[in-house]
């Protein structure tokens, strides 16, 4: 990869409207802020629409033993198994793990990370 092949997009992900697909969708701490079922389904639908076949979805969320809130906002916590279940229809699970993240404030937060490969467009 080079910097000419990277696209940074700043928008409300649930209102994403593009005319192209991506090879890599990297979400480090957005998905866990999406807490209602309809919005979770919309996010998954957008991943399916905008990640090209064979593309990668890399997602990091608070783990099951992570915080209940972040910056005063409600969040949803996930395990590797939870994420596998949510994305199983159109994405092949590649790997998943938990990681303890040290914050600038000297605390630690538990995260779940997963990597998936897009297998179909349904």
Stretches with model-predicted labels:
Residues 1-20, 37-122:
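Class I (Rossmann-like) S-adenosyl-L-methionine-dependent methyltransferase catalytic domain
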Residues 23:
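Conserved acidic residues
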Residues 26:
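A conserved beta-strand element that flanks and buttresses the S-adenosyl-L-methionine
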């Amino acid at each position: 990869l080079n910097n000419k092949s990277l696209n940074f997009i700043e928008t409300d992900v649930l209102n994403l409207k593009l005319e192209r697909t991506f090879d890599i969708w990297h979400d480090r701490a957005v998905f866990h802020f999406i807490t209602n079922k309809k919005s979770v389904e919309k996010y998954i639908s957008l991943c399916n629409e905008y990640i090209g076949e064979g593309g990668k979805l890399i997602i990091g969320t608070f783990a099951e033993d992570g915080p209940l809130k972040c910056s005063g906002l409600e969040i949803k916590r996930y395990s590797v198994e939870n994420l596998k279940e949510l994305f199983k229809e159109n994405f092949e699970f590649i790997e998943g793990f938990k990681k303890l993240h040290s914050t600038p404030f000297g605390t630690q937060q538990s995260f779940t990370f997963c990597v998936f490969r897009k297998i179909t467009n349904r």
